[in-house]
Amino acid sequence: MPQFVDRVVLHLQAGDGGHGCASVHREKFVPLGGPDGGNGGHGGDIILEVSSQVHTLLDFHFHPHIKAQRGNNGAGDHRHGARGEDLVLQVPEGTVVLNSKGEAIADLTGKGTRMIVAAGGHGGLGNAALASKSRKAPGFALLGEPGEAKDVILELKSMADVGLVGFPSAGKSSLISVLSAAKPKIADYPFTTLVPNLGVVNVGHEVFTVADVPGLIPGASEGKGLGLDFLRHIERTAVLAHVVDAASLEADRDPVADIKALEKELANYQEELASDSGLGDLRERPRVIILNKMDVPDAADMADLQEEELKEFGWPIFRISTVAHKGLDELKYALMDIVKAHRKANPVEEKPAQVITPKGLRKRSGGRFAEFEVEADPSAEDAFIVRGEKIERWIRQTDFENDEAVGYLADRLAKAGVEEALYKAGADAGSEVTIGEITFEWDPQTAAGVDVMRSGRGTDVRLEQNTRATPEERKRASQARRGLIDENDFGDGEVAERERWQG
């Protein structure tokens, strides 16, 4: 089972919005209570939060499918549905979020920093919120919007102070095991280390962290070997330590050649970086050279032969043996001094917790008018596509099983100018029109240039046909019953309906 996971693909489904409620108030002696349907609750968001208690993406490796809670539906008596609970996923500091195309969306640093990675759908309005002067009791409500569904990639970049770099089998894992309490896998063959190992080194009352990353080979910046899986873990390190096998017997390998090959790959990788990590150019960070395996016969003689050339790099040189535990204390104190100097020269400001909202996140567009565009559908004749965030949201929220809801949608589209735009684009009655995921045959409600009808198609006729007697009529009915007036003695145009008077 993997213990360290630094790259995962998540399949996210934010919570759907709850549906609005279509309800009419019912109460004794209140026959015309009016609409009282409540709104649906918003769906839950999926949020990434930086936590100091998490150091790997291991949990997401086993549970990549993540779904947030749905909003509750509205109910009668103006009861609104509860909002779906947000789902907060804790990630380690240094996590980079990429979209499905591999493009970086956000770099999560700073404890408590949050990012809304998938937005929940908005709840639908109930018929109480849809009532107006011309539509007194709508017999429909709006549906809740579906939550965002997307795939994102999480990549973890190590946040160590010192990064151990070197060719495979140079002794990096052995070094971190003797400097700290880390227990990496150690064996005498290349690429024993396949994932980074992190260790904490105590130097008196001070500490620094060190990362043992997978071995490097020529062409790593182009993806060879472990390639970018190695290189991204040294982007954030403050100090780079070249670990060199001083006892290598290969003809084309020596300490100087190894370091030059490593530096070439680092330079190539720096040119590919899209943004600065905050620690400056990777090629300008402090470096040290660690000649390992000095306990091997002839290793010291080989190091002596290369001493002058190694000094030309201008970096401190340390000779150690992880097997014999020689030179380790001197190395630890030297690394601590370099780390302290680098921290002082590059102070890291404590970033306050913030909420990051990526540009691609779906959100409701404000304003009274809907922006849209109409274009011909290239895949079919006499077909058109209408694109617009607000227009497409109207489609998602319409219950197409309810004729009154469809009429309400048609009114909204006409008032927004969609019909006029379709006329100008060359559409005729019967043309196929696609909005969002819905395709329908266009049945224009108005001729070109004619104003839209003011009375909405969703008007409830029942409330306009009032059959109750007026107070004056009830008064005259009472007088007629008592014989004060003749019940047939009415003015022209009046109709005597005893049942109505007495009702």
UniProtKB/Swiss-Prot annotation:
Kindly list the places in or outside the cell where this protein is found, as annotated in its UniProt entry: Cytoplasm
Q: What is its EC number?
A: 3.6.5.-
Q: Which cofactor does it need?
A: Mg(2+)
Residues that, per the record, bind GTP:
166-173, 191-195, 212-215, 292-295, 321-323
Q: Which CDD domains match?
A: Obg
One Pfam family per UniProt: GTP1_OBG
Q: Using the UniProt record, give the first listed, main subcellular location.
A: cytoplasm
Q: Binding residues for Mg(2+), per the UniProt record?
A: S173, T193
Q: Specify the OBG-type G domain's residue ranges.
A: 160-340
GO cellular component entries: cytoplasm
Please list the residue ranges that the record marks as compositionally biased, kind Basic and acidic residues: 457-476
The UniProt record lists the keyword Metal-binding: yes
What are the start and end residues of every segment in region (Disordered)? Answer: 457-503
**Residue ranges annotated for the Obg domain, each copy included:** 2-159
Enzymatic class: hydrolase
Q: Which residues form a coiled coil?
A: none
- Protein's UniProt keywords contain Magnesium: yes
Role played: An essential GTPase which binds GTP, GDP and possibly (p)ppGpp with moderate affinity, with high nucleotide exchange rates and a fairly low GTP hydrolysis rate. Plays a role in control of the cell cycle, stress response, ribosome biogenesis and in those bacteria that undergo differentiation, in morphogenesis control.
Subunit comment: Monomer.
State the similarity comment. Answer: Belongs to the TRAFAC class OBG-HflX-like GTPase superfamily. OBG GTPase family.
Name under which the protein is recorded: GTPase Obg
Provenance organism: Corynebacterium jeikeium (strain K411)
Lineage at the top is: Bacteria, Bacillati, Actinomycetota, Actinomycetes, Mycobacteriales
Name the gene for this chain.
obg
